[in-house]
């Protein structure tokens, strides 16, 4: 079960070193799995009802799914030898909706999503099309990864 989607999951796991980031990835037709990492550097800033973040860096080599073979396939599809990190270059939001720019596998794309601040944590959700990042045709014995994946991330705020 190869999943380049987990690559994106790792990238958007916007958390600090102390928190663990998770991303939900949907497989077709097998169901869902989660990719997790705590190797994320950066944080978000909250001022009133506005939030912002820059240069959130996720080390994709440390993304884990709980299945060693799937982890290896993820590394392959994310091409972590050449692109070891995913980066949220910039993001801003107001009133629970936000936009940003990310880089995965050397490709930069604009994103949009929703968020909420809970205490000292910003929780965000957004969708990505992994084909936009050159991750295509992931399939093993009839089981593939959807091109559209949903990322759920948590980021510490200051």
Please place each PLM-identified region on the residue numbering.
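Sec/Tat signal peptide C-region and signal peptidase I cleavage site
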Residues: 12-18
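Low-complexity, acidic/polar, glycine-enriched regions of mature
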Residues: 18-158
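Acyl-CoA-dependent O-acyltransferases
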Residues: 7-10
């Amino acid at each position: 079960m190869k999943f380049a989607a987990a690559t994106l999951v790792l990238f958007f796991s916007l958390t600090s070193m102390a928190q663990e980031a998770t991303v939900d990835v949907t497989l077709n037709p097998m169901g869902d799995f989660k990719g997790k990492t705590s190797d994320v550097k950066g944080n978000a800033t909250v001022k009133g009802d506005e939030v912002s973040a820059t240069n959130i860096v996720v080390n994709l080599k440390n993304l884990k799914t709980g299945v060693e073979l799937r982890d290896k396939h993820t590394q392959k599809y994310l091409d972590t030898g050449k692109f070891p990190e995913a980066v949220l270059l910039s993001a801003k939001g107001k009133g629970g909706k936000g936009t940003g720019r990310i880089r995965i596998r050397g490709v930069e794309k604009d994103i949009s999503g929703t968020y909420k601040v809970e205490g000292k944590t910003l929780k965000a959700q957004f969708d990505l099309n992994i084909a936009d990042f050159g991750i295509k045709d992931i399939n093993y014995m009839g089981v593939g990864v959807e091109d559209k994946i949903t990322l759920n991330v948590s980021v510490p705020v200051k």
